[in-house]
């Protein structure tokens, strides 16, 4: 299954979860899209619940199925900690996600575009790979030629608050992941245990 590139609002309504972090997708129509949407949230089987939870997390970070599964396998090889949370930490450390958390982009999709287009530096070097794994303490900044890109400036201005696990200098347009987040600081609406159960059956 490839990465979803369709309308994020429609996908958010299908999953019952905001994918932009604003909640606007669900503000007016908190039901699945389609003619029978308001009455179409049928009871899911155990497998259906696990699959739905996996899709929620995957679409939240905008990651393709193959890459998502590979990250789970990597998380399963980490000896310390809890598998489900370790998996979420690997997703959090993606460069596109850190760019989003810093407020340099309004959505993860936009952050991924900024990385792909070469606007983002890591410790002063351009990195155009959205899946690049950020280490706490690395400096994420905007390259000099991109400092006046309107979309980036608008995103910074629109950001009202940032997570406690990042730091950001609005004048320099740079910041860092200061530490790994705690479980209660990310995706409280996700039940990662269901995702672990899903992949334990599949792998």
Swiss-Prot record:
Q: Name one GO cellular component term.
A: small ribosomal subunit
**InterPro entries, per the entry:** Ribosomal_uS4, Ribosomal_uS4_bac-type, Ribosomal_uS4_CS, Ribosomal_uS4_N, S4_RNA-bd, S4_RNA-bd_sf
Q: What cystine linkages occur within this chain?
A: none
Top-level taxon in the UniProt lineage: Bacteria
Which GO biological process categories is it annotated with?
ribosomal small subunit biogenesis; translation
- Which keywords accompany this UniProt record? Ribonucleoprotein, Ribosomal protein, RNA-binding, rRNA-binding
Instruction: Note one Pfam family from the annotation.
Output: Ribosomal_S4
S4 RNA-binding domain sequence ranges:
93-156
Q: GO molecular function of the protein, one example?
A: structural constituent of ribosome
User: What SUPFAM superfamilies does the entry give?
Assistant: Alpha-L RNA-binding motif
Q: What does this protein do?
A: One of the primary rRNA binding proteins, it binds directly to 16S rRNA where it nucleates assembly of the body of the 30S subunit.
Q: Which family does it belong to?
A: Belongs to the universal ribosomal protein uS4 family.
The record's listing under PANTHER family reads: 30S 40S RIBOSOMAL PROTEIN (PTHR11831), SMALL RIBOSOMAL SUBUNIT PROTEIN US4M (PTHR11831:SF4)
Protein name according to UniProt:
Small ribosomal subunit protein uS4
């Amino acid at each position: 299954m490839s990465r979803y590139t369709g309308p994020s609002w429609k996908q958010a309504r299908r999953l019952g979860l905001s994918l932009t972090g604003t909640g606007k997708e669900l503000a007016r129509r908190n039901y699945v899209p389609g003619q029978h949407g308001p009455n179409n949230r049928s009871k899911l089987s155990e497998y259906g619940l696990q699959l739905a939870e996996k899709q929620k997390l995957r679409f939240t970070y905008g990651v393709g199925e193959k890459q998502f599964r590979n990250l789970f396998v990597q998380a399963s090889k980490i000896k310390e900690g809890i598998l489900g949370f370790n998996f979420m930490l690997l997703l959090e450390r993606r460069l596109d996600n850190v760019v989003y958390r810093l407020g340099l982009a309004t959505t993860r999709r936009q952050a991924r575009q900024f990385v792909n287009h070469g606007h983002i530096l890591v410790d002063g070097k351009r990195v155009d790979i959205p899946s690049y794994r950020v280490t706490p303490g690395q400096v994420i900044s905007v390259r000099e030629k991109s400092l006046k890109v309107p979309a980036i400036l608008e995103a910074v201005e629109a950001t009202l608050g940032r997570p406690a696990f990042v730091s950001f200098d609005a004048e320099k347009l740079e910041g860092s992941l200061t530490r790994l987040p705690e479980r209660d600081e990310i995706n409280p609406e996700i039940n990662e245990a269901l995702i672990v159960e899903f992949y334990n059956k599949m792998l």
